[in-house]
């Protein structure tokens, strides 16, 4: 089946896949070929896609996914392939984000810190999946 990932900056991914596991707002969602039509919200998290070459991990920064006519279209705020991520840097940023969350004084600061922490944790998880 065909999968496209689109961010505000344009196409990030346009490939044939065999299977995908998405970080939906209700938990992990697995999709195989000929899946029923579906529209779902996506959380910040790791997407795993099985291509002819094997499994690939990408970090998605929240958005929506549509499954229709054996094609998956993913619209997200941002995306990053695991092979582009420096694990040591991501772990350092995750620790900083956790510290920022602990020091957040206002509800708005807490929300922003939680989102930042989720992004860095997803990056660490994506790289760990690829190893």
From Swiss-Prot:
Pfam families, per the entry: ATP-synt_DE_N
Domain of life: Eukaryota
Gene3D superfamilies: F0F1 ATP synthase delta/epsilon subunit, N-terminal
Membrane topology: Peripheral membrane protein
Chief localization: plastid
Transmembrane regions: none
Function according to Swiss-Prot or TrEMBL: Produces ATP from ADP in the presence of a proton gradient across the membrane.
Subunit structure: F-type ATPases have 2 components, CF(1) - the catalytic core - and CF(0) - the membrane proton channel. CF(1) has five subunits: alpha(3), beta(3), gamma(1), delta(1), epsilon(1). CF(0) has three main subunits: a, b and c.
Record protein name field: ATP synthase epsilon chain, chloroplastic
């Amino acid at each position: 089946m065909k999968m496209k990932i689109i961010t505000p900056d344009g196409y990030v991914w346009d490939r044939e896949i065999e299977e995908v596991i998405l970080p939906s707002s209700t938990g992990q969602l697995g999709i195989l070929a000929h899946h029923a039509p579906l529209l779902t919200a996506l959380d910040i998290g790791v997407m795993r896609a099985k291509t002819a070459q094997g499994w690939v991990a990408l970090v998605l920064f929240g958005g929506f996914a549509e499954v229709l006519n054996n094609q998956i279209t993913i619209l997200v705020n941002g995306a990053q392939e695991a092979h582009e991520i420096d694990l040591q840097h991501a772990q350092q940023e995750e620790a900083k984000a956790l510290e920022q969350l602990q020091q957040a004084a206002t509800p708005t600061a807490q929300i922003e810190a939680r989102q930042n922490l989720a992004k860095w944790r997803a990056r660490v998880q994506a790289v760990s999946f690829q190893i």
